[in-house]
């Protein structure tokens, strides 16, 4: 399933917004630095994963067809277009409703 650019932007903005929220109680000193570092690592990991996933889905959707799918596409491209029925040629006019409407093609 390809990830649309709009959805990717929404996910990234959500990750940025939650990483920027202050914590309740406000830890101070070394704990605060550690929490900020952990949040930065999580944010970086999430962004790396989303970039990898977007690249992977883009390659998967543009990848070549293999096996049965390739044969089916080749058969459809090489084959003659489907023939229209000869019944239309024999019966060009048809009454749809009694005494009201007829269609001639």
Curated annotation (Swiss-Prot):
Q: In which tissues is it expressed?
A: Expressed in a subset of GABAergic cells in the cortex and hippocampus.
Q: Where in the cell is it found?
A: Secreted
Superkingdom of source:
Eukaryota
Task: Report if keyword Membrane is assigned.
Answer: no
**Sorted UniProt keywords:** Cleavage on pair of basic residues, Disulfide bond, Hormone, Secreted, Signal
Pro-sequence residue ranges: 19-74
InterPro entries from the entry? Somatostatin (IPR004250), Somatostatin/Cortistatin_C (IPR018142)
GO cellular component labels: extracellular region; extracellular space; synapse
- The protein's predominant localisation is secreted
Q: What does this protein's UniProt record list under function?
A: Binds to all human somatostatin receptor (SSTR) subtypes. It also inhibits cAMP production induced by forskolin through SSTRs.
What is this protein's name? Cortistatin
Its ancestry begins with: Eukaryota, Metazoa, Chordata, Craniata, Vertebrata
State which gene encodes it.
CORT
């Amino acid at each position: 399933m390809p990830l649309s650019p709009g959805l990717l932007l929404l996910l990234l903005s959500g990750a940025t917004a939650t990483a920027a929220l202050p914590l309740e109680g406000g830890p101070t000193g070394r704990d605060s630095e550690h929490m900020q570092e952990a949040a930065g690592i999580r944010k970086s990991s999430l962004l790396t994963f989303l970039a990898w996933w977007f690249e992977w889905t883009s390659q998967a959707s543009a990848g070549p067809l293999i096996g049965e799918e390739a044969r089916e596409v080749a058969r459809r491209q090489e084959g003659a277009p489907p023939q229209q029925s000869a019944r239309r040629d024999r019966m060009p006019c048809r009454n749809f409703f009694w005494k009201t409407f007829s269609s001639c093609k």
